[in-house]
Design a protein with these regions (language model features):
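A structural signal for short, well-ordered beta-strand segments and their strand-loop junctions
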Residues: 7, 45-48, 97-102, 125-128, ...
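Short catalytic/ligand-binding loop motif for oxyanion handling, primarily in non-cytosolic enzymes
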Residues: 14-16, 53-57, 106-110, 115-117, ...
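A short acidic, often aromatic-flanked loop/helix-cap motif at beta-alpha or helix-coil junctions
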Residues: 71-78, 133-135, 225-231
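Short, surface-exposed amphipathic charged segments that create phosphate/polyanion-binding patches used
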Residues: 79-88, 139-145, 235-243
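GT-A fold catalytic core of metal-dependent nucleotide-sugar glycosyltransferases
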Residues: 82-140
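PAPS-dependent sulfotransferase catalytic domain
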Residues: 125-170, 204
Length: 244
């Protein structure tokens, strides 16, 4: 049985997090992620659409591999990655646990799969969070499209308004639970987010909705899963993932 850490690096389209179009063959954007996963002796897979064969060969090793994908521009990269993960995981066997993360602003601080909190909770979803509540100005704007598409979205926002804002830049769990969550997340995007023409991707909105309405009873977020978001706690080693 294996544990996996997956990430996706799609270039050639506007990156909403960096406010720019990323260079096609720039390994330095994923280098820290790859090195941190390899240092923990975990299997990491980087899905990409534009790395050269030369760079893939140069930076592949015992732990890190590259998988070329065809990007479908019908969905923003922040959303399309979930379809990539779903389709990849559906084809492989002997997977015990999975985390999926952002790739350019996340590094692994320690192996999450051997932590007592993880091993004792095979039916839990683990994810990042932010030091703010779900009810905030950015999320209200971010969720405009989903709010108009999903009948119960506004009620969910009201119910969980004062709860911590979850961050989909880091999430994972034991495989059966994780894959169930991932399939439901993809279904939400395919059903409600395919016609999104707003300036927001909907990835955070769909993730928080699903985690809170269907997985909230078995949800772990914050320490030790992640450092404080955007606190740039680069020296912390007591959490599983550093996220900015």
């Amino acid at each position: 049985m294996q544990h996996l850490v997956l990430a996706c690096h799609i270039t050639g389209v506007y990156d909403v997090n960096r406010n720019m179009t990323l260079a096609d063959d720039s390994y330095d954007l994923v280098q820290e992620w790859a090195e941190s996963v390899a240092a923990a002796k975990l299997k990491g897979v980087i899905f990409h659409n534009n790395f050269s064969d030369e760079n893939c060969a140069r930076y592949s090793n015992e732990y890190i591999s590259f998988e070329r994908i065809m990007y479908n521009p019908a969905f923003n990269p922040n959303v399309y990655r979930y379809f990539v993960y779903r389709d990849y995981l559906a084809k492989i066997t002997q997977v015990q646990g999975v985390f999926v993360t952002d790739v350019s602003d996340v590094t692994l601080a320690q192996n999450p799969f051997i932590h007592p909190l993880f091993t004792a909770n095979p039916d839990s979803l683990f994810c990042g969070d932010e030091p703010k509540t779900l009810h905030n100005e950015w999320m209200l704007a971010h969720a405009e499209h989903l709010r108009g598409q999903m009948e119960d979205y506004a009620a969910y926002e009201e119910r969980f308004a004062s709860e911590a804002l979850l961050n989909c830049g880091v999430f994972g769990g034991s495989f059966p639970l994780f894959f169930d969550f991932l399939q439901q997340l993809c279904a939400l995007h395919e059903t409600y987010n395919h016609s999104n023409k707003t300036a927001y991707t909907g990835d955070m909105g769909a993730f928080n909705y699903l985690a809170r309405t269907r997985f909230n009873a078995n949800l772990h977020h914050g320490a030790p899963v992640n450092t404080i978001f955007k606190a740039y706690e680069n020296d912390r080693t007591d959490c599983w993932f550093r996220h900015k």
